[in-house]
Amino acid sequence: MIYTVTFNPSLDYILRLDALEKGEINRVTYENILPGGKGLNVSMVLKNLGHESRALGFVAGFTGEAVKKQFESFGCTADFVHLAEGFSRINVKIKAKEETEINGQGPLIPEAAQKELFQKLENLQDGDTLVLAGSIPNTLPDDIYERIMEHLAGRGIRIIVDATKGLLLKVLKYGPWLIKPNNHELGEMFGKELKTEEELLAHAKKLQEMGAKNVLISMAGDGALFLTEAGESFKSPAPRGTLVNSVGAGDSMVAGFLAGFEESGGSWQRAFFMGVATGSASAFSENLATRPEVEALLRNL
């Protein structure tokens, strides 16, 4: 079973405008409300690709109920901790000539609720996969990723971490199965600008020496690189298409990677290219990637 963790799920209010004029009344040409959060995105894309998962996290108030209802309307399984106070955040995504985001803060997460999450993590078994994705809200301890990984150590659970450079560096000692920095984050981890494929792979190798098993490097319009624990490396150009929506593309890449890995019986090559295709399919669409969109892009990789 695949599990995802989203500490601070949201309702994403998505607005498209011809132009955003500050201080004026702006009228939208498109609007939608979707469940948001990196782990939820991974679960929804997995569902679109035909794979089940169970989403863990915290929700609160009427907005939390809406997050759960919307998420389950996609056929996904939620196993959230429901908080007694506060409300889940609303994030506003404005898409005009430039993308602008206004993200809410989210509810206070008390220690008792944190313990309840850890109780749910007890259900994970040998061979399961756990996706830890996104930032840590300021209402949680800043070492929560490390605590979760330490709690699950030695149980045969594949853990994927998709987070900022600081969080990634902290969890390497726990041997994450997969990490997914982009090329800029990878350079920032080592305090330098990495310009070539050789430099990127060399520093991905350094992350492996620090504990990571497999390193997936996204490079936006330049494609992606992948270094496996066996020392194999793969490269893919970015599929051709028009960028419509950057939100969720990285999460979709993780979901596609997992789907490809599961479907192929553990082929790194299939996992990598399906990850690239799925991330791009979401970027080229108003919504998250679907199976037909992914298959169409795969044929050209």
List the model feature ranges, each with a label.
Residues 2, 52-53, 78-79, 159, ...:
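Hydrophobic anchor at the start of a short beta-strand
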Residues 142, 146-230:
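Conserved phosphate/ATP/ADP-binding segment of small-molecule kinases
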Residues 83, 93-126:
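Conserved phosphate-binding/catalytic loop of the ribokinase/pfkB sugar-kinase fold
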Residues 101-103, 128-134, 162, 180-185:
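Short beta-strands and strand-loop turn motifs
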Residues 27-87, 301:
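Substrate-binding N-lobe of the ribokinase-like
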Residues 1-23, 32:
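Positively charged, low-complexity intrinsically disordered leader regions
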Residues 151, 197-301:
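Conserved phosphate-binding/catalytic region of the ribokinase-like
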Residues 90-94, 224-227:
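Short beta-strand scaffold segments in enzyme catalytic cores
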